[in-house]
Amino acid sequence: MHKILLVEDDPVIRQQVGKMLSEWGFEVVMVEDFMEVLTLFVQSEPHLVLMDIGLPLFNGYHWCQEIRKISKVPIMFLSSRDQAMDIVMAINMGADDFV
């Protein structure tokens, strides 16, 4: 079973996306403590990271860079932001895709 690390600060969106992914057959690890993103990444060994940009403490770009230092796992930003600059920043920070 493929594992997805879901990094989303909005609890409603996190639960909805997590439920949908689980129903599609994925194992989902949901981050709720945003100081633990890197720790949960290492512990869970996901096949994909779905991440929001606007997170408390450190934004998604920061965590993308930190994950890129240790792994080539695909990182996809899942965000309501749709400005070209947000997409360019995500790709420049090491993301593989932006939805």
Please place each PLM-identified region on the residue numbering.
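N-terminal/domain-start alpha-helical segments
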Residues: 1-99
